[in-house]
Every structure is written in structure tokens, then in C-alpha cells.
């Protein structure tokens, strides 16, 4: 059956379908039951049906099939028959499945909203019109096949791999709508159904392919739910990499192993001014195995081409023999290389030599302690270039030789564990040590080794120093060298090796020198006669010459060699080089670390006593969660008891790899605020010792002063009374005056004489006179208590109660503390309506600064190319735009060193040394980013209890962004404090953030942070200042000595200290991606609420309460809802009422209760007051509650207070009662004394 092209059909242009033969009509009848008598009848009916119902045109296909079979047997094409029977050949192509309903619907919608992206005439992907944007995957190269869209200015987002631009006005009608609603189920795209489940889009494997990048995924309403970027093959199904939307926020879903689905564009390479696809090299040369030298020259010519590795792969795998062994293609590149000899400073017993196992580089960037060692031998490859895991090959003089891998060893202070080998590289886990040795045993059972000084101290993962991974523990972020032999982004340079001197090739024969080549190409030069130099591949005799006058070297230009600073460069080939990928890339992974035993914790008064049991050295750190964190840390190696003071703001303790422990103190004490004076003083002394001592001292001084004043006034009055009678002989003191002044009437006597007289003569009068002042004091105290002007309980409750959270309009504004996890209630009073209670709780608060990246810094790698060594030739350095590049020419080096200098010079040589710095291979994972931090934006998650429903919303706290909770509009912010824990300059390293005044870009200092700088981990622009200085080589062996400052990045890693996650004030939690501070308990959060009229309940519709009374049977202050109050009421009708405390210092747990008839309700409240007096409003009626609260029994709790904490505790009613009594008694004494003094003075003045 032939189909109309899809675009034509769905482009709304109708064309009649071509005629095709009608299908054969077959009547399918039910299978007859097996009956003995009806068997023949059933066969007859079946035969008749076949004869009458079968169509004639069906015979034609049988002939075609017959001809087809004959044609396959003959295998001789006939021109006439082939021309006529060409359509039957294409019949399998016509059997394509007809597009289903999903495909047809998608094609119809796609016809208007997607456009092809073309590059050099080929479709590489698609662009889609969605909403008011045209979207194209950023990895799709090319331009949109539309004149209007091609000229748009696109904005690129590398994070989402997307490019966007505004749709032209005249094309907005063609755009598709988008939606963030994605219920699990099936969706549609160009190739059929897409399943969405578990947050992932999947399709049957094979339904998508490269070239589909940019295609949209639609729901059943034709709305775009995602745009395809690529896919990851997972067996029977393929997981799609897509860009989608979640509540108007763009998100990218990338499954592991996803590949981009843009159509690959062939990369071109160059050969003799002729371009060709890099994946298809020409046949001259086309294969390394046929023409190795020419193939390597071709690769060197294209070493900087983007398709170099395609060309390398194609050149090395073009042989059929190698294709059959493609499972070992990762080792295939090593057939174009060879091992080599290089200088080793210690080959055993302190002697240096040219070793076959020379150490080139030791890398220790992995935080799990694994070492990556580069040596001069090659592991896993035999001398015939075949792969064998059990073998290694090394350079034996100038010929490679095989050895067993089992003889390979690595050791520091003790033998290491080799975890991976390939080519020049070894992975090993080693104990601590100061040297590193690599060795092997060759086929002759001779041991070779090389030792380098190297300080190895495995880093600490996490906060515990452990030696082996536990079976159970905590997964911690770390980095390691992945044990993968596949090609990676890391690479090394290789070049053509220099000629290798070999004196054994020459022998003296009767005054002549014979050169034996042994099937090699040998370069020779003799200083006897003329024309005694050149290349030879056959044995050659130099007449009339001596061996000492000749020099012979093996020339091999069929293999590359690692570009080592320990081996000279081939002078003839200059800077020609190649590149190969290396195994074992550094990657971020997780390492399982132990979790320290939980400490035994004992709580004291404002302190925590922790008994620690470390199994190995474990880090203990703690900080205050207030404005001054006072961060402290220490490594605990043995059992230890620590005492930590818990401040009012809370204490955060981190022990090992456990989650942090958080503690808050409670106002616990041994005394009570409702007892005797000494108990009250003890209560306040334990809570506030300094203030209590000051207050008691001042009060005692005042009282004693008052008593002293009273005594002084009495003495003055008595003296005024006695003086006139003492001066008059025989005077008699009046009775009333003698009674007031305590003197005898007839004869003035001292008080002591009067007291002695009464004690001896009239003891009842003595006691009566002593009781009179006490009785007067008691009477005066009772009078003072009955005075209406006396002060009631003086508490901070009266101050805090002013201005309860009420408002008389539907526009309500309130301010809540910026404390996460503490509910906050506000009451909305509107005239004519029943009060409404709103409960709000901050679930999280985020401060996200605006960052601008200055640069990234990481460990640098010093690149030392093989030096140029020439014989008495002039060499000149050339300027190169390389980071920290240094070049020097040294003359007169390596005197009389033929073999060492690889040079035909018997006097002196000239060496050109070069060096520069570049980013280490570890920079892709191990780097620190230097940011400038600007104004921070605040946002938060808010839980709102509104109309009986708990709703969680996210809002920006900027005073402008509005969120809707049902039918109410909430506007949060701006925050009362613009505080942020981040300085103007911050450094981000993995998941840690540090405040640091780093040097600006281009001004780094050697050995410090920023000594090497780059804009991004992938960028090529690198600035470096490492104090790299080349030094003169010493005699003995070819080398490039230099001096350089140590890596500033590695030094910073050791000295960086604690991150903001541990040192930030106000208990901030710091996170990255993006950089943000969460749940900082600082400042207040204003909230504006716009409540519609329909949300209120009229007073006539709400129940009214009467006869309300409140009783508090139990109350524990400073505890989480430790108070209980019983409110009795009489309700007019059944209904719901809002419950709210009219005092800030008291928080009620319940927000709404149901009332009915004469009943009572119990509410729980929390307060910090010892003597709480507050009013509770239920519906529109208020009731007064008074509670005498006792201190909590728990000293420390692991949750913050749910009530307003007062800076100074209130004074209880009992304490005020004692103050009134004591003050009243002393005041009465002073008043009586003053009255007596006044009367005496008046009488005294009247006489004069």
C-alpha cells in the first residue's frame, strides 16, 4: 500500500489517494468441533469457500515470489525482468508501519511549530515555537531554515543547553502552548508514545535517533510538555534528556549516560593540501599497519584538528585483523608508541641510571588517597603490539622486551596495592611514606626499580581519620581515579624519538669498522676520511677506521614516544608531535566513611556534658547559633569528657560524620518564683545571677538607709523633747511627751535606766512598751495594702501586652520573627465580623546572593618538553603565548657525553630548555571558584493556616512578589535586616563556601591562592605566576632542571580552615548550586495580607459566648506548651470560634475550636513568664487568665522555644507581694518617725 507523504497530507492540502487493488476478502468461520460424521462435510464446506471467495488478482504475487526465487538461484540478472520487477524489490520498504494516531496527531501539530536546523544543507536538529519563544537546543549547530527566525538574536543558556529568542509577531499564531502539568502516563512525539513515570521520559529503544534533538513532546491537548535534547540507552527502553517546566521554572532532566541527539557533522582533516573526512582517511596512507611512518606524519600534520582522534582511530583500526579484536580497541593506540629509557635518580642502593621503569609523574589529586603513577614502561601490551593483561613491555637497550605483570611492584613505607594498570599508568593505594618506588622483574629474573622522593600522606575523607572503609556508614563526597580503560578527555603528548646510540652495533675487523644493523635502520658517522656518515639498513664496513672514531645510533620513525623532559627531542623533526588519550580519569564519587559512636550526653544548667568514645581520631566542632558563633574544633583521639556552655540562642555540635546535634537551654532553676523570699532570691539568682545580686544589694541598701533615717529622726525628736526639761531643775515631763519620747516624767533618765527599771519593777510594762512599735508597724502595713493606689504586680507582661496583633480591616500587616520552625499567630478583627486567626510558620528562608565569577583556580601542571640538544650549534628561543612560559639556551653542557646527549659531538653541546604551566588534568573536578557577591535576594517557604487549611507557599521576600493562598494574597518582605553571611568576595570549593579576600584576575602571587587562574574549568585562557625559573643542566644525563613555587591551590586546601557551613552566625546553613544561606535566625519578616470579604464570617452568623471564666491548673514556663488552661463558657449556638492570645508573651497552640452549649475547652499555651496574666479571645469574647508558672525540670532541649523569649524575666506576683510587705513595713517606720519629729518640732518652735 502506498502512502501520501506526511507533510503533504498534514499541510491541509488534499490529494486523492492512488488506486490500489482491494484487499482479499476472506470469511473466517469458527473451527468445527471434531465430530466423526461431520468430518467430510466440514472439508467440503472449506473447499467451497476457498473456490468462491478467493480473488483472482492474488495469483500475481505468487508468480512474483516464484520469479524471485528463481532469480536468487540463477544469480544472473536479466535486464528486462529487473526493469519490470523493480517494485517488488522495494516491497520490504513499503511494509513500513502506518503512522498511528499519536504520530499523526504530533505530525499535524509539528507542521506549524517546528522548523529544521540545517548546517551545510544537512538537517542537524529542530527549533520549536513554544509560547512566545523560539527554542533551539544549544548543541545543535546550524541555522533555522526560516528567513525570519534565522536572523533573530538568541540568548544562550549553557545550564539548560538551550537557545531562546522572541517569536516575531506575525508568527505567534503558529506557536504551541506549553504546560507544567505532567501527570504520569503517556505523551506523544514524532515517533509515537512517550512514557512519563518517576520524573523521567522514556521511549522504546530505537524510536529516537541523532537528529531528533529539538523535537517537542505533546500532551493530549496539543500542549508542549518538554523538548527533547538527547537520550540514554537503557536496554529495552531509552531515557530521554529533556528540558521541561515545573511551575513556570525551566528544569533539565538528564539521565545518566545521555548523549546529545544532534546530527553529527563530519570534521575535515588535511593531507597534502587536500581535505578529507577525519573518520575516512585516504588510502595513501590509510592504515598504520601498512605505512606506519607516513601515517604518523599525517597524524602529526592534523594534531590540532578537532577531528584528530577520529583520524587516529580510523588510522589504527582500518586493518581487518584489528577489527576482529575491537573489544580491545582501548589498547590499540599503543601499537603506535613504544616504551623508553629515561634517567632515574635512584635505581637502587643510591645509584642513578637510565632505567626502563623511570618515574615521569606522580599524581595525588584524588581525595580517596589513590595515586596515579606514570612510568616509562607499558603495561598490558606485548612487543608484538597485542593486548595481554598479564604482560608488560619495557625498553631493553633499544629493543622492547616482554615481562610478567605479576612482577610489578609499588611501595612507599610498605608495599602498595595496585588497583589498575594500562599503558604507562599505574593506580595504587599506598600507606604514608616519604619515597615512592616502582619496580619489576624482567624475563631474565633481573629486578629493575626506580625510587623518587615523594611525600605521601593520604587525605582525610570527612571528619574521621579511618584506614579502611566500613560496611555501614555515611556516603561522603570524594574524588578518585576511575578504573576505566576507555578514552578520556585527558591526554599526553608524544613525539618521534631521537636516535638511540648503540656502541654494540660496531666491531673492529683488521683496521676496519663493521656496522651490523640487525634488521634496523642505523645512522652512522665516522671521523676518518670523507663521506663516512649516513643511513643504512644493511651491514656496512668503514675502511681504515677505528671504533673510537665512529658513532652509530638506531633510527626508528615508526613509533611515537612520550614527550619526556628526561629524553632529548628529535632535532630533525622539531616541534612535530601527536597526542593520545590516557586512562583513569579523575571523577567525583562518594566514599563510605564511618560514623562515630553517639556520645553519652548529660544535661546541666546551661551546659551539655558529652562523653566521647572515638574509635579513631575524630573531629569535634561546635558553634553558637547567635551573632557571635565562636567556632571551636579539636581532634579527639581517646575517651574524653567535654563540657560545653549552651547560650540562649542555641548550640550546634558536630561529632565526626554524624549529623549536627542542636541544643537550646531552658530557664530551669532550683528555686521558685512563688515561695518565700529566700526561694525567690535563689530562683532569680540562678537565672540572672548578676542582676539579682545588683537588685538585692540596692534594695538592701535602700531599706537599711530608710531604717537609719527613721532611727535618726526618732533620736532627733527625743533629744528635742528632753533638752528643755534637762535644763530646768525639778521639772516634770508631761505624760504624753514621756510616752512618745520614752522618757520618765519626773526625772529625765536614759533609755537604758528606764529599761532596767521596768525590767526590775514592772516586766509586763516592759513587754507592752516593746510591742507598741511592732503593732503600729503592722497596722500601717495593712493600711498600705488596702490603698487602691498600690502597685500591682510589676511585670514585663504589661509592657509586652501593649498593642496586641489585631487590625480592624481586611488589609492586614504583621511582622513575624525570622525563625524557622516556630509558629506565629495573628488575629484579624474586622467590625461586624467574627475575628479570624491566621497562623504562619516559616519552613525555610533562603538568602541567595547575586554572584559574578572572577576566575577559577586549581593545581597547575608544569609542562617540560623534551629539550633540544645540538652539537656546537646556535639555538634561539622563540616567543610563545603560553602561561608562565620560560625558555633558555645553555651552552657548553654535557661535555664528552655521546650516549647521554644522544648527539654526534665529542666536545660540548648546546641545550634549549623550555617550560610552561597549564591547568592540571584534575582541574575539571578539583577547582575553587572565586566569586564577587552582590545584593542577596531573600525567599522562603511559608506555611499558612487559613480557613482551616494548611497551605505551603514559596515567595520572594522583596515586598513586591505576591502569592495566593486560596483567595487571600500574601506579600512577604522586605526583611528588616539586609544582613548576609557572605562577604563581597567568596570562594566556593565543592560544597563549601569561604569568605576570602582573594587576589583579582591577573594579579596572582606565586605559592598563594590564585597563582593559576582561568575563567572557567573548560576555558583555554589561563593566567599563571608560579615563579618558574629554568636552571642550567648538570653533567651526567639529559634533563631540564628548574625551580618553581609550590601550588598555591594545594597550600590553600591545607590551610583553608573551617567553611561558612560551620562558622556562619545565627545558625545559618550554607549550601551551593546555587550558593545560598538558609534558615538564618536574624531580623524580622513583615507580611502584608489582603483578605477578601467572603473569607470573613458575620457576627450574626457566628456563635456568641457568655459566662466565660478561665482557670489554669498547671503551668510550666519556658517549656514548649507547658501550660494548660480550662475555659468555661455558654455558647448561643453551635459553631467554630477562633482562639487567640491578646498578649505577645503567651502563645496558644489551638487556632480554632468548636463550641456548643454550656461546656468547657482546654487550651495549651507556652510562655516565658513566671507569673503570666493574659487575655484569651474566643470568637468576639475575651476572658482573663492568670497563671503561676513553675520552672521546667529539663535543663536542655533539642528544639527552640515556641514563644517569645524575654531579655529579662518578669517579677512574679508573689515576689511583688513580699516587696510590698517589706517596703510597707519599713515605710511605716519611717512615716511614724517623721510624724514624731514633726510634732516635736512644732511644739518646740511654738515655745520659742
From Swiss-Prot:
Biased composition range(s): Polar residues: 1-10
EC code(s) of this entry: 3.4.21.90
Biological process per Gene Ontology, one example term: symbiont-mediated suppression of host toll-like receptor signaling pathway
Domain named Peptidase S3: residues: 113-261
Region (E1 fusion peptide loop): 893-910
InterPro entries: Alpha_E1_glycop, Alpha_E2_glycop, Alpha_E3_glycop, Alphavir_E2_A, Alphavir_E2_B, Alphavir_E2_C, Flavivir/Alphavir_Ig-like_sf, Glycoprot_cen/dimer_sf
Biased composition (Basic residues): 60-72, 86-101
Region (Ribosome-binding) location: 99-113
Cysteine pairs bridged by disulfides in the record: 113-128, 269-278, 283-287, 286-318, 344-450, 347-353, 416-430, 478-591, 526-550, 528-545, 721-742, 858-923, 871-903, 877-887, 1068-1080, 1110-1185, 1115-1189, 1137-1179
Site residues by UniProt (Involved in dimerization of the capsid protein): 187, 220
Site (Cleavage): 261-262, 325-326, 748-749, 809-810
Transmembrane spans: 693-713, 764-784, 796-816, 1225-1245
Residue numbers on the Extracellular membrane side: 262-692, 749-763, 817-1224
Reactions listed under catalytic activity: Autocatalytic release of the core protein from the N-terminus of the togavirus structural polyprotein by hydrolysis of a -Trp-|-Ser- bond
Region span, Dimerization of the capsid protein: 183-193, 219-223
Region Transient transmembrane before p62-6K protein processing, residue ranges: 721-741
All ranges on the Cytoplasmic side of the membrane: 714-748, 785-795, 1246-1248
GO molecular function per UniProt: RNA binding; serine-type endopeptidase activity; structural molecule activity
Region (Functions as an uncleaved signal peptide for the precursor of protein E3/E2): 262-274
Pfam family, one: Alpha_E2_glycop
Lipidation positions, renumbered (S-palmitoyl cysteine): 721, 741-742, 1242
Region (Disordered): 1-104
Motif (Nuclear export signal): 144-154
Biased composition (Low complexity): 73-85
Record protein name field: Structural polyprotein
Amino acid at each position: 500500500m502506498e502512502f501520501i507523504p506526511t507533510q503533504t497530507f498534514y499541510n491541509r492540502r488534499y490529494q486523492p489517494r492512488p488506486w490500489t487493488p482491494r484487499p482479499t476478502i476472506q470469511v473466517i468461520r469458527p473451527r468445527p468441533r471434531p465430530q466423526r460424521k461431520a468430518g467430510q462435510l466440514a472439508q467440503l464446506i472449506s473447499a467451497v469457500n476457498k473456490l468462491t471467495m478467493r480473488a483472482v488478482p492474488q495469483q500475481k504475487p505468487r508468480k512474483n515470489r516464484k520469479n524471485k526465487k528463481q532469480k536468487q538461484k540463477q544469480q544472473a540478472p536479466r535486464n528486462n525482468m529487473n526493469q519490470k520487477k523493480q517494485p517488488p524489490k522495494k516491497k520490504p520498504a513499503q511494509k513500513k508501519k502506518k503512522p498511528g494516531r499519536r504520530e499523526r496527531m504530533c505530525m499535524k501539530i509539528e507542521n506549524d511549530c517546528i522548523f529544521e536546523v540545517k548546517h551545510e544543507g544537512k538537517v542537524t536538529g529542530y527549533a520549536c515555537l513554544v509560547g512566545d519563544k523560539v527554542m533551539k537546543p544549544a548543541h545543535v549547530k546550524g541555522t533555522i531554515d526560516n528567513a525570519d527566525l534565522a536572523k533573530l538574536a538568541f540568548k544562550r543558556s549553557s545550564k539548560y543547553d538551550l537557545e531562546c529568542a522572541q517569536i516575531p509577531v506575525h508568527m505567534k499564531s503558529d506557536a504551541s502552548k506549553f504546560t507544567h502539568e505532567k501527570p504520569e502516563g503517556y505523551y506523544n512525539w514524532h515517533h509515537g508514545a512517550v512514557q512519563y513515570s518517576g520524573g523521567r521520559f522514556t521511549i522504546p529503544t530505537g524510536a529516537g535517533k541523532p537528529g531528533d534533538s529539538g523535537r517537542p513532546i505533546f500532551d493530549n491537548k496539543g500542549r508542549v510538555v518538554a523538548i527533547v535534547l538527547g537520550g540514554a540507552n537503557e536496554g529495552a527502553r531509552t531515557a530521554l534528556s529533556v528540558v521541561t517546566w515545573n511551575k513556570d521554572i525551566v528544569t533539565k532532566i538528564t539521565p545518566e549516560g545521555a548523549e546529545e541527539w544532534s546530527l553529527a557533522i563530519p570534521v575535515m582533516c588535511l593531507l597534502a593540501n587536500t581535505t578529507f573526512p577525519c573518520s575516512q582517511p585516504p588510502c595513501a596512507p590509510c592504515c598504520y599497519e601498512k605505512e606506519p611512518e607516513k601515517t604518523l606524519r599525517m597524524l602529526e600534520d592534523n594534531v590540532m584538528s578537532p577531528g584528530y582522534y577520529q583520524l587516529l582511530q580510523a588510522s589504527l583500526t582500518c586493518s581487518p585483523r584489528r577489527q576482529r579484536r575491537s573489544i580491545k580497541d582501548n589498547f590499540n593506540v599503543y601499537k603506535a608508541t613504544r616504551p623508553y629509557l629515561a634517567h632515574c635518580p635512584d635505581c637502587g642502593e643510591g645509584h642513578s641510571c637510565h632505567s626502563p621503569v623511570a618515574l615521569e609523574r606522580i599524581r595525588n589529586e584524588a581525595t580517596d588517597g589513590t595515586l596515579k603513577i606514570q612510568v616509562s614502561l607499558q603495561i598490558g601490551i606485548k612487543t608484538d603490539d597485542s593486548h595481554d593483561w598479564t604482560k608488560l613491555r619495557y625498553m631493553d637497550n633499544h629493543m622492547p622486551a616482554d615481562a610478567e605483570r605479576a612482577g610489578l611492584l609499588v611501595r612507599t613505607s610498605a608495599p602498595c596495592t595496585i588497583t589498575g594498570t594500562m599503558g604507562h599508568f599505574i593506580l595504587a593505594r599506598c600507606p604514608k611514606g616519604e619515597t615512592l618506588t616502582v619496580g619489576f622483574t624482567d624475563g631474565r629474573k633481573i629486578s629493575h626499580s626506580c625510587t623518587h622522593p615523594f611525600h605521601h600522606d593520604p587525605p582525610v575523607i570527612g571528619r574521621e581519620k579511618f584506614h579502611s572503609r566500613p560496611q555501614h556508614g555515611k556516603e561522603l563526597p570524594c574524588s578518585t581515579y576511575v578504573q576505566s580503560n576507555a578514552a578520556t578527555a585527558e591526554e599526553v603528548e608524544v613525539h618521534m624519538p631521537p636516535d638511540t646510540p648503540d656502541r654494540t652495533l660496531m666491531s673492529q675487523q683488521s683496521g676496519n669498522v663493521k656496522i651490523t644493523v640487525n634488521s634496523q635502520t642505523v645512522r652512522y658517522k665516522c671521523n676518518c676520511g670523507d663521506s663516512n656518515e649516513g643511513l643504512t639498513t644493511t651491514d656496512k664496513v668503514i675502511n681504515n677506521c677505528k671504533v673510537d672514531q665512529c658513532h652509530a645510533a638506531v633510527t626508528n620513525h615508526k613509533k611515537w614516544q612520550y614527550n619526556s623532559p628526561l629524553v632529548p627531542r628529535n632535532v630533525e623533526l622539531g616541534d612535530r608531535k601527536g597526542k593520545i588519550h590516557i586512562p583513569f580519569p579523575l571523577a567525583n564519587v562518594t566514599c563510605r566513611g564511618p560514623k562515630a559512636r553517639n556520645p553519652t550526653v548529660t544535661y546541666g544548667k546551661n551546659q551539655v556534658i558529652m562523653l566521647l568514645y572515638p574509635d579513631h581520631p575524630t573531629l569535634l566542632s561546635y558553634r553558637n547559633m547567635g551573632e557571635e558563633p565562636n567556632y571551636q574544633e579539636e581532634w579527639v583521639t581517646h575517651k574524653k569528657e567535654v563540657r560545653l556552655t549552651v547560650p540562649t540562642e542555641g548550640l550546634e555540635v558536630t561529632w565526626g560524620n554524624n549529623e549536627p546535634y542542636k541544643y537550646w537551654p531552658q530557664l530551669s532553676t532550683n528555686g521558685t518564683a512563688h515561695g518565700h523570699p529566700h526561694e525567690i532570691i535563689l530562683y532569680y539568682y540562678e537565672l540572672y545571677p548578676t542582676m539579682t545580686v545588683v537588685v538585692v544589694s540596692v534594695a538592701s541598701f535602700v531599706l537599711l538607709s530608710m531604717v537609719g533615717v527613721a532611727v535618726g529622726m526618732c533620736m532627733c525628736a527625743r533629744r528635742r523633747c528632753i533638752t528643755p526639761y534637762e535644763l530646768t531643775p525639778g521639772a516634770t515631763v508631761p505624760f504624753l511627751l514621756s510616752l512618745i519620747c520614752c522618757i520618765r516624767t519626773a526625772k529625765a533618765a536614759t533609755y537604758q535606766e528606764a529599761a532596767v527599771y521596768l525590767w526590775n519593777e514592772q516586766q509586763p510594762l516592759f513587754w507592752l512598751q516593746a510591742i507598741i512599735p511592732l503593732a503600729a508597724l503592722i497596722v500601717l502595713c495593712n493600711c498600705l495594702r488596702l490603698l487602691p493606689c498600690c502597685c500591682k504586680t510589676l511585670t514585663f507582661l504589661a509592657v509586652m501586652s501593649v498593642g496586641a496583633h489585631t487590625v480592624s480591616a481586611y488589609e492586614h500587616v504583621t511582622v513575624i520573627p525570622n525563625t524557622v520552625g516556630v509558629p506565629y499567630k495573628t488575629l484579624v478583627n474586622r467590625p461586624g465580623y467574627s475575628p479570624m486567626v491566621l497562623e504562619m510558620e516559616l519552613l525555610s528562608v533562603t538568602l541567595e546572593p547575586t554572584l559574578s565569577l572572577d576566575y577559577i583556580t586549581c593545581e597547575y601542571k608544569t609542562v617540560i618538553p623534551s629539550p633540544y640538544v645540538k652539537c656546537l650549534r646556535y639555538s634561539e628561543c622563540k616567543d610563545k603565548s603560553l602561561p608562565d612560559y620560560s625558555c633558555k639556551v645553555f651552552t657548553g653542557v654535557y661535555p664528552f657525553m655521546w650516549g647521554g646527549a644522544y648527539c654526534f659531538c665529542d666536545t660540548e653541546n648546546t641545550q634549549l630548555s623550555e617550560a610552561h604551566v597549564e591547568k592540571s588534568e584534575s582541574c575539571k573536578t578539583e577547582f575553587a571558584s572565586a566569586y564577587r557577591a552582590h545584593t542577596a535576594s531573600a525567599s522562603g517557604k511559608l506555611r499558612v493556616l487559613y480557613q482551616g487549611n494548611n497551605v505551603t507557599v514559596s515567595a520572594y521576600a522583596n515586598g513586591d512578589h505576591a502569592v495566593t493562598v486560596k483567595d487571600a494574597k500574601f506579600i512577604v518582605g522586605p526583611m528588616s535586616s539586609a544582613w548576609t553571611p557572605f562577604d563581597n568576595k567568596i570562594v566556593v570549593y565543592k560544597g563549601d563556601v569561604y569568605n576570602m579576600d582573594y587576589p583579582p584576575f591577573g594579579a596572582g602571587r606565586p605559592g598563594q591562592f590564585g597563582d593559576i587562574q582561568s575563567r572557567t574549568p573548560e576555558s583555554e585562557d589561563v593566567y599563571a605566576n608560579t615563579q618558574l625559573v629554568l636552571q642550567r643542566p648538570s653533567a651526567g644525563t639529559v634533563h631540564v632542571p628548574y625551580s618553581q613555587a609550590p601550588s598555591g591551590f594545594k597550600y590553600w586546601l591545607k590551610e583553608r580552615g573551617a567553611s561558612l557551613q560551620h562558622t556562619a552566625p545565627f545558625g545559618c546553613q550554607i549550601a551551593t548550586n546555587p550558593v545560598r544561606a538558609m534558615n538564618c535566625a536574624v531580623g524580622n519578616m513583615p507580611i502584608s495580607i489582603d483578605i477578601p470579604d467572603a473569607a470573613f464570617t458575620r457576627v450574626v452568623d457566628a456563635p456568641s459566648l457568655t459566662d466565660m471564666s478561665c482557670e489554669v491548673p498547671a503551668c510550666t514556663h519556658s517549656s514548649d506548651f507547658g501550660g494548660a488552661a480550662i475555659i468555661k463558657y455558654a455558647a448561643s449556638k453551635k459553631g467554630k470560634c477562633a482562639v487567640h492570645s491578646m498578649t505577645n508573651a503567651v502563645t496558644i497552640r489551638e487556632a480554632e475550636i468548636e463550641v456548643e452549649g454550656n461546656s468547657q475547652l482546654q487550651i495549651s499555651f507556652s510562655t516565658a513568664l513566671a507569673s503570666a496574666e493574659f487575655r484569651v479571645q474566643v470568637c468576639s469574647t475575651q476572658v482573663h487568665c492568670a497563671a503561676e508558672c513553675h520552672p521546667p525540670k529539663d535543663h536542655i532541649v533539642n528544639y527552640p522555644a515556641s514563644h517569645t523569649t524575654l531579655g529579662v524575666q518578669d517579677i512574679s506576683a508573689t515576689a511583688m507581694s513580699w516587696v510590698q510587705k517589706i517596703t510597707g513595713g519599713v515605710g511605716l517606720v519611717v512615716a511614724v518617725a517623721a510624724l514624731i519629729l514633726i510634732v516635736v518640732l512644732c511644739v518646740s518652735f511654738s515655745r520659742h
